Amino acid sequence: MSSEEPPARTSWWPRLLGRLGVAEDAEQGDDDGSVRAGAAGPPGDPDGAPRRPPREGRGAEPFPPSLAPGSEHLDAALRTLELTVRRRLDGLLQGNHLGLVPGPGSEAGDARVYQPGDDVRRMDWSVTARTSEPHIRETIADRELETWLVVDLSPSLDFGTGGCEKRDLAVAACAAVVHLTRGGGNRVGAIVATGQDLVRLPARGGTVHAHALMRRIAGTPRAPEGTRGDLLGALEALRNPPRRRGLAVVVSDFLGDVDWDRALRGLAMRHDVLAIEVGDRRDEELPDVGTVVLADPESGHSREVTTTPTLRRRFAAEAAAHQEQVATALRAAGAGHLRLRTDRDWIADVVRFVVARKRGWSGQGSAPVLTSTPAGRS
């Protein structure tokens, strides 16, 4: 293995391979915990660098800008992200679709046809009498919503083989939530977890605070490789001390042990919960590249494997089983579930989710779990 080859950035492959009985090769690691690619690099360009398409032109628009912490271009990238979010969300989500949380509230809203399962206490008898069809009266959510972001920025998010890193996608998702929930006296705060640090950013209102909040989230230093994520600790930090009822948005790749399910159920007893799962194609399937050395940034462990068809099938099955375990835990908590991918138009996925969610609240369909189909697949 040549010492000139670049370090291989990978996601959680070694942990999944361990479940499949593939032996660990700890000697492949360098002194700094990184590993170097073997005969074939990790998914991305042939030299081992993750593939990132050009930022110029319309083809770059579906992907968020690079939001590397500490970069002198971070403020400019955040302004670009904000303009993109405002232009595309405001253009596609209008009226009652511009928001993430429905009633109940104290202000009367529109009447609609009764659907099985609706609360009969909200029956509008005057409209029912005029139309000879049962109607209920919806309510408008009270103002001054308090939204909390729980943002997982552990080392497994410092990875991406599509148009961006998962970390960039997580920050972009936060920007969309802030845009959809601010205004009208609403407040937004955040708990940012890297596995090494846990940062609490108080909930406040106003544009100045929203900009400062996004700068703090995007500027969170990367945790060193070998640092385990701590989503459970972040959820517990939001639960205790108890905060006023509102919206809790959990942004993570949800890789690793599902040890956070009880904490999430406890959180959902007090708040509306939305889980935003950011993923990459290579979290779900191994590339057909022959022999490759893979490194887990959250453990520092590495494995050299040959990506045979059998191993790739077993890996994909194990990854799918993990995704289903995560989805089951989120359903058990009653959380909304939005999946975003580094190779997808993330804002289009957000729009579809919000529209479907509103339809579910209005009785036109069930509350959605939006899954993203990779580009080029059916």
Where are these regions (language model features)?
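Exposed, interaction-prone extracellular/peripheral surfaces
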Residues: 2-100, 113-118, 127, 132, ...
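N-terminal juxtadomain amphipathic helix
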Residues: 120-122
